[in-house]
Amino acid sequence: MGQKTHPIGFRLGVIKEWPSKWYAPKKEYSKLLHEDLKIKNYIKERYKVAGVSKVEIERIVDKVRVKIHTARPAIVIGRRGQEVENLKKTLEKMLPGKEITISVVEVRVPELDAQLVAQDIATQIERRVSHRRAMKRAIDNALKAGAKGVKVQVKGRIGGAELARKEWFLVGRMPLQTLRADIDYGFATAYTKYGILSVKVWIYKGDVLNGR
């Protein structure tokens, strides 16, 4: 069961926080959900080179608070905060009548952020770096940064093979069924001339004993 369950979704409300925090009547729920997806996809597309790990959204009545976690906050903020102001104006056009607040959080150790690691591996594969080399390098960097365990998986027509297959490496522990285990998960897609490869990364950082 633990192999098939999303590592973050499995721990929501236990040691992980929801990426979107708001309440809405049943009739408006789907509308707000699509707005959230639109905001997140737009920000990730706009700041591809900034290493955006995740985007959190909190709604209180007509106020929308957007928190961007990125490895390169200077790119998102811009010179004298001009870029983040431009982003705010764009989001206000996307969500008319809403008061937008944007905060930028720096990911201080990107080697321990599963989403950023997955994106980096996918980028290297697209640049024709050996997938095994990229996977092993990511694992080494994560372990040096303090990870207790790392698992990396690449799936698809690896190296242009006729049949799709998956390859994975696991170093250290990966207690997927332990709720208190702080496991980060990331997914990215690599677009190659042979087709699409999926990259999945699990990083075990240790146990959380005092809840969130």
From Swiss-Prot:
<dbReference type="InterPro" id="IPR015946">
    <property type="entry name" value="KH_dom-like_a/b"/>
</dbReference>
<dbReference type="GO" id="GO:0006412">
    <property type="term" value="P:translation"/>
</dbReference>
<dbReference type="InterPro" id="IPR036419">
    <property type="entry name" value="Ribosomal_S3_C_sf"/>
</dbReference>
<dbReference type="InterPro" id="IPR001351">
    <property type="entry name" value="Ribosomal_uS3_C"/>
</dbReference>
<keyword id="KW-0694">RNA-binding</keyword>
<dbReference type="Pfam" id="PF00189">
    <property type="entry name" value="Ribosomal_S3_C"/>
</dbReference>
<dbReference type="InterPro" id="IPR004044">
    <property type="entry name" value="KH_dom_type_2"/>
</dbReference>
<protein>
    <recommendedName>
        <fullName>Small ribosomal subunit protein uS3</fullName>
    </recommendedName>
</protein>
<dbReference type="InterPro" id="IPR004087">
    <property type="entry name" value="KH_dom"/>
</dbReference>
<dbReference type="GO" id="GO:0003735">
    <property type="term" value="F:structural constituent of ribosome"/>
</dbReference>
<comment type="similarity">
    <text>Belongs to the universal ribosomal protein uS3 family.</text>
</comment>
<comment type="subunit">
    <text>Part of the 30S ribosomal subunit. Forms a tight complex with proteins S10 and S14.</text>
</comment>
<dbReference type="GO" id="GO:0022627">
    <property type="term" value="C:cytosolic small ribosomal subunit"/>
</dbReference>
<dbReference type="InterPro" id="IPR018280">
    <property type="entry name" value="Ribosomal_uS3_CS"/>
</dbReference>
<dbReference type="InterPro" id="IPR009019">
    <property type="entry name" value="KH_sf_prok-type"/>
</dbReference>
<keyword id="KW-0689">Ribosomal protein</keyword>
<comment type="function">
    <text>Binds the lower part of the 30S subunit head. Binds mRNA in the 70S ribosome, positioning it for translation.</text>
</comment>
<dbReference type="GO" id="GO:0003729">
    <property type="term" value="F:mRNA binding"/>
</dbReference>
<keyword id="KW-0687">Ribonucleoprotein</keyword>
<dbReference type="InterPro" id="IPR005704">
    <property type="entry name" value="Ribosomal_uS3_bac-typ"/>
</dbReference>
<dbReference type="GO" id="GO:0019843">
    <property type="term" value="F:rRNA binding"/>
</dbReference>
<dbReference type="Pfam" id="PF07650">
    <property type="entry name" value="KH_2"/>
</dbReference>
<keyword id="KW-0699">rRNA-binding</keyword>
<feature type="domain" description="KH type-2">
    <location>
        <begin position="39"/>
        <end position="108"/>
    </location>
</feature>
